């Protein structure tokens, strides 16, 4: 019994720390990242089981999931970095908020990614 609790103690410690120290917006982004992993995994599993007959469709969908995952990780990193910088120093605020800039970059890059994904469908 004690060996099982010894195995799960670090995991429960990480989960507790994550729940206490992570704000809601980052948790929402993490949930979206999990969703993208599940959707990409389902698409890849479907391609393995059934086949990739419309290969453009498979590539477009799978690469769209992977690309959106990468873009979202970059967005999360930008938000985390801005939180660390804002808590450590009090600099003069720029014209555009770093949070707004990160969100606009996320939106623009997502639009470009999905524009190319839809065009690749043929």
From Swiss-Prot:
The keyword Transmembrane helix applies. Its main location: endoplasmic reticulum. The keyword Iron-sulfur does not apply. Pfam families: DAD (PF02109). Keywords: Endoplasmic reticulum, Membrane, Transmembrane, Transmembrane helix. It comes from the Eukaryota. One of its GO terms (cellular component) is oligosaccharyltransferase complex. Residues 52-54 are lumenal. Residues 1-30, 76-101 are cytoplasmic. Pathway: Protein modification; protein glycosylation. It is found in: Endoplasmic reticulum membrane. InterPro entries: DAD/Ost2 (IPR003038). It is a multi-pass membrane protein. GO terms for biological process: protein N-linked glycosylation. Disulfide bonds: none annotated. The chain crosses the membrane at residues 31-51, 55-75, 102-122. Subunit of the oligosaccharyl transferase (OST) complex that catalyzes the initial transfer of a defined glycan (Glc(3)Man(9)GlcNAc(2) in eukaryotes) from the lipid carrier dolichol-pyrophosphate to an asparagine residue within an Asn-X-Ser/Thr consensus motif in nascent polypeptide chains, the first step in protein N-glycosylation. N-glycosylation occurs cotranslationally and the complex associates with the Sec61 complex at the channel-forming translocon complex that mediates protein translocation across the endoplasmic reticulum (ER). All subunits are required for a maximal enzyme activity. Belongs to the DAD/OST2 family. Component of the oligosaccharyltransferase (OST) complex. This is Probable dolichyl-diphosphooligosaccharide--protein glycosyltransferase subunit ost2. It comes from Schizosaccharomyces pombe (strain 972 / ATCC 24843) (Fission yeast).
């Amino acid at each position: 019994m004690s060996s099982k609790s010894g195995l799960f103690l670090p995991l429960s410690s990480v989960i507790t720390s994550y729940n206490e120290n992570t704000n809601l917006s980052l948790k929402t982004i993490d949930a979206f990242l999990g969703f993208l992993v599940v959707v990409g995994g389902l698409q890849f599993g479907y391609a393995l089981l059934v086949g990739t007959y419309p290969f453009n469709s498979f590539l477009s969908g799978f690469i769209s999931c992977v690309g959106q995952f990468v873009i979202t990780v970059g967005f999360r990193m930008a938000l985390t970095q801005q939180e660390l910088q804002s808590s450590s120093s009090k600099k003069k605020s720029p014209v555009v908020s770093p949070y707004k800039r990160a969100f606009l970059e996320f939106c623009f890059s997502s639009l470009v990614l999905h524009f190319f994904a839809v065009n690749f469908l043929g």
